[in-house]
């Protein structure tokens, strides 16, 4: 029996919990939950589309940058390959010079003029380039300069041979403005002619003091590799910056000089403008290895820089980990790629306004508008359905209340009272608690109706119902079961306690006068019958009500306005 009792208590608690949950999760909450789930899923789907679109945008930016970077790299690679070819030719000429009379005469002429402040050796202006040089005294003043080598004559003839190759290799369509060989022995060969001999020393010292020459000493360039430098030109009158690619010329572990090609940044800018697609937005910028701005494809920023120091630091930090990539800076997307044949990096800057005007911007705007439209329609639908459900719920609650209550007394009607009474009686029986019933009948109610009218009778019923309700405990249930008859259910109350409640009801009804008409008051009374499961152990509500009703009539027969709690009253 103990196990059955525990199982029943657990079942009742579960049912109570489910009822509480059902009351809390009303139709309105369920509608809200459904719409929130739909809104979340639609937002997640839209967000997923945005992520895919962003990945496609980043890939597009990198592809555009890669196309321009490859084109620039190929052009620079062509110049580097020419430089390597010239160095190989120079090395061959140093080891095995051509045995031409004109070359031997050039060596003799060098010996004749080497002490002069400035000199120039020229074989054939139409076929080769002249060798321009300075005196032994001027060479001795330089730390990196020296004529103390056994192959000096071979270097002179090799320079003339390279001059021939330089003249053939140099053309106006190339990005290279000047190609030259500068020797540590005090002379140079350049595709840019020196019109006056008196300018040779100035130009030579302009060459040998440039970073692209000094940077090829054995200490600075141990691997003897091709290097790129950004510098000002050797001509004081020309202030345009330039990029120089250079390579050392060595033979038998001796450093003879440097072969170099100078590329003005304006030609690189023109190349960038020609390489990009005119239908695409975005600005291309070229930086050297130290992130110093060289040039831009945007004519509005030919010498400017749109990055502040903080942004340059962020860009440099990102470039430390990869050779290509992208980063967002405020309303700009910056992608970069290091060039293979240039010691620098090409950067593409795409602003938000440019992105909005492009294809991805149009798709993004359309996607945003669709999401906003769907969300607006969803919110409107939620509001309409929520109002409808709320109104229906209020109407349902009102109808349910009317179905369960007496509209006049606002107590439970007969059917609802019986529905409430049965489970309460069963619960009391399960826990072996007493279960009591009080039957109430107003005395002389028909006379009040006949004398003062039904309106007054209704007021009496409403007044009596209010007094009965105020006399009950929180767990007690009252209802109207007939015209002037009321029934009170007292779960857990013994017969004595129920009789006390009944007496309290009787006193409240009898001690207060009520106004039923102008200057007319009456005092009402009631007869009450009380029954309890304690008497017979019977928890059947209908039997207990019948017993209480019989005792009520005993109270009426005994003179009315009294409580009868036994058959012997």
Curated annotation (Swiss-Prot):
Site (Transition state stabilizer) location in chain: 446
Cofactor: Mg(2+)
Top EC group: transferase
Pathway where this protein functions: Glycan metabolism; bacterial cellulose biosynthesis; Purine metabolism; 3',5'-cyclic di-GMP biosynthesis
Residue ranges constituting the GGDEF domain according to the UniProt record: 433-568
GO biological process: cell adhesion involved in single-species biofilm formation; cellulose biosynthetic process; negative regulation of bacterial-type flagellum-dependent cell motility
Keyword flag Magnesium: yes
Subcellular location as annotated: Cell inner membrane
Keyword Nucleotidyltransferase tagged: no
Active site residues of this protein: 484
Major place of residence: membrane
Residues in the signal sequence: none
E.C. code: 2.7.7.65
GO terms under cellular component: plasma membrane
Protein keywords: Cell inner membrane, Cell membrane, Cellulose biosynthesis, GTP-binding, Magnesium, Membrane, Metal-binding, Nucleotide-binding, Transferase, Transmembrane, Transmembrane helix
Transmembrane segments: 25-45, 365-385
Subunit structure: Homodimer.
Function description: Catalyzes the synthesis of cyclic-di-GMP (c-di-GMP) via the condensation of 2 GTP molecules. Cyclic-di-GMP is a second messenger which controls cell surface-associated traits in bacteria. Involved in the regulation of cellulose production.
Record-linked PANTHER family: DIGUANYLATE CYCLASE DGCQ-RELATED (PTHR45138:SF16), REGULATORY COMPONENTS OF SENSORY TRANSDUCTION SYSTEM (PTHR45138)
The protein's name: Probable diguanylate cyclase DgcQ
Organism for this UniProt entry: Escherichia coli (strain UTI89 / UPEC)
Highest classification ranks of the organism: Bacteria, Pseudomonadati, Pseudomonadota, Gammaproteobacteria, Enterobacterales
Gene (UniProt): dgcQ
